[in-house]
Amino acid sequence: MPAESTASPTAGLSRRSMLAGAAAVAGSAAALTASGAEAAPLSAGTAAAPSAADRITEQPDRTGGHARATVFKNVRPYGAKHPVDLTVVDGVVSGDPAPRGAKVVDCKGRIALPTLVDAHIHPDKTAWGEPWVTRNPASSIAEYTEEDVKLYHALRTPLKKRAERLMGHAVAQGTRAMRAHVDVAPAYDLVGVEGVGSARRALRHALDVEIVAFPQHGVIRTPGTKELLEEAARTGAIDRVGGIDPIGFDEALEEHLDVVFGIADRHGVGVDIHLHERAATGMESLRAIIARTRALSLQGKVTVSHVFCVPGLPERELDRLAADLADAGISLTTVAPSSDLVLPIDRLREHGVEVGLGSDGVRDSWSPFGNADMLHRSHLLAWVRDARLDEELEAAFRAGADGGARLLGLPEADLEPGSPADFLLVRGECLPQVVVDLPRREMVVRGGRIVARDGELVGH
């Protein structure tokens, strides 16, 4: 955010702070107005279905199968003023004229945007699509994990089906890839890894998925967990091994990291550690993770998620830490939980630290909220960062699209020739408005193929 003028009598106050003060003076009516920014959008996001004349239309491919070619006519990349034709050949955006007889999709002036990447989600825990779950009070990780186990046994739908349902919904809302954290503990054995792995195979035409074996119950404090993590990595069922709060929860920093980094080193998998620890405790764990990454030459293969010890660091300390993270090739993820816990993405990126955005839990025992919609998560990121300017709203979208792609090692779907033809189509005037209004995803395209229409998967 740009610094406010020191000459202003309100210097140091954000727009939201000033609105809150005005609401307190003006009374309940003003308070309702100030809080309305969090309400569901009432414009494009809830617009009626298009008329028959305004619907996106398709004409079949008549190339004889020599090339999988489609022309998406009348699209406005990123909300450009004038529509263009986007040609896709064999799943890639092409700068050449389309082959004669190519399939034609008339997009009627819709905005085309890159599909997004969910860099941190827990699809195994979800109750998405299930009957309402009444949650019990919980105030510690240990208590939440107990609630996880209760919910796991209470849900009648198999984990595989629940995960696939949620992951398919994510695709229909415009997600092209995700990193799925899956609980591994004696309470579940490897059921979650197997279930999410099955969902990954079922959706491979539409979604790239990395699986993290996540020791939610602790690596050291729960006997049998490290053996399950080892088995998951040895069998090739996972892409990364996880960890959680080595000091604050597992109470064994060195032993915890010995197990996690040892598995990564032996089996050639990456690392993604949940770090909720704050202040000095979190910094001690983070510094130890940096040291292990360097010692084992795992640059580019380690991510730390949440990292609540980073927001609020003094500028000099943040700059030193960011330089060390970049040097070690360690990436970070945030789920934009609140203004005081969201990562300082811009400052980290200035130092070369990749930062991804994720959904976290979706309708699980931890929270009744969540929807696996990364456009909505970009909206939430903009909200907690007090975005106001167009470029600030666009940056929130870029965090959900490009930040996650870089973190997962995927090419950016930037709609330029040579890029993967992964995009979504929505109504709207411009990208900033889309971030605010959250319009219906009328079409989602993966590798040039239409995989979803109006929020529903097609051909699945």
Please give the residue ranges for each predicted region.
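Active-site gating loops and adjacent loop-to-helix segments of metal-dependent hydrolytic enzymes
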Residues: T126-L159, R240, H267, S285-T303, ...
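Active-site core of metal-dependent hydrolases
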Residues: A206, V212-P223, T235-L343, E354, ...
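C-terminal cap of metal-dependent C-N hydrolases
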Residues: P417-H460
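Divalent metal-coordination and catalytic microenvironments
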Residues: V75, G91, G109, H120, ...
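Alpha-helical scaffold segments that flank or form the walls of functional sites
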Residues: G129-H181, A187-A202, L228-R234
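His/Asp/Glu-enriched, well-ordered alpha-helical/loop segment
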Residues: R292-V302, D346-G428
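N-terminal metal-binding scaffold of metallo-dependent hydrolase/deaminase domains
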Residues: M1-G101, L431
